[in-house]
């Protein structure tokens, strides 16, 4: 499990390899990740948008930006949490993801809540020892 906290917003990510959605012989590896966002702060916040950096095992970086998460822009009161699961296909058996959520307060202030960097590792990864 991976965790980051920004201004009272805790983001926890738990990734996993999805064998049944993958086809290693065709260089297709699918990963799912479950995210929990907890408002440990003292004011209401709303998740407005997301920004992901996805880096495959060859170092190729893809950036993904969009409104909300899984079609939602959840409002979190102090003490509330929101969880969702999404997925990421790669053409390599490993990679990593990191990013941020743009959050806004009731007063209209925006800030970036860090999404911790997390590794995507499949059992098909061949480790080389020199």
UniProtKB/Swiss-Prot annotation:
Record InterPro entries: ApaG_domain, ApaG_sf, Uncharacterised_ApaG
SUPFAM superfamilies on file: ApaG-like
Any Pfam family hit: DUF525
Domain of life: Bacteria
UniProt domain ApaG: residue ranges: 3-127
Disulfide bond positions: none
GO BP of this protein: error-free translesion synthesis
HAMAP family referenced in this protein's UniProt entry, alphabetically: ApaG
Protein's recorded name: Protein ApaG
Gene: apaG
